[in-house]
């Protein structure tokens, strides 16, 4: 009997050590993942003919450092080629920076909007120690949107576009903090961060156990004071009154498009959805630029108005 108890204790100890180690490693990879270099993104976008840096730099613009609530500066560029009170705020995805938002900026400025592109927390030239996939980032988005209203007047009309982490950040902002924007465009958001991590763990480690999430979350709380289970757009999307256009390419393996299907079902009208047959993660615009533009224009015309 004593030997069995010793064996049981040893097994339990090994189990705890294993999942504690996995949880710590996973939290490190997720909180401190390697970011793409700005110049690498510029070259990628230029080669794909989605970026003409000289043309972008010739647009009327202001580089602004906006104080975050978390004691760092948010690096933003306000691009204003149009004489209008209509603004788009563009939120990039994880590992990217504001340069990757320029392809959308070109689309929206052609539609008559002015645009704000900015580096998310810990990305590009914005401060911040940890990436939290929308938990703290939503407060920075709130700060950027409030800056637009404070500096361009209370009668401005703001739309927000986000892709991947930026889309999740946008939905969390709209559902938890503020409904100041007129409309939202969500491209390839996850429905819950926990489900997305389970998907990633199962792909890259072949281990999809919920226990890894539990131990990972313990280290999230200890190291960055947030819970991954609170990063859940699906829980708040029904609180958004304004129109939302959901976009998600069906071949996406990183965040399956079923995440967006769930979000769309939960959102109350007005809403619209488009699921392109081509393109991987956040490649809906890259693979279908003209259709993307038509879908966005139709959504704005039908649900917002020009």
Predicted stretch roles:
Residues 108-127:
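Conserved alpha/beta-hydrolase
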Residues 131-152:
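Alpha/beta-hydrolase active-site loop
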Residues 239-241, 246-248, 252:
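Short beta-strand/loop motif that positions the catalytic acidic residue
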Residues 287-306:
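Catalytic active-site module of serine/aspartate enzymes centered on a nucleophile-bearing elbow/loop
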Residues 4, 10-67:
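An N-terminal hydrophobic leader/cap segment in hydrolases
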Residues 172-226:
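Hydrolase active-site cap/lid region
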Residues 264-282, 289:
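Catalytic histidine neighborhood in serine/cysteine hydrolases
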Residues 94-107:
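The serine-hydrolase catalytic nucleophile loop
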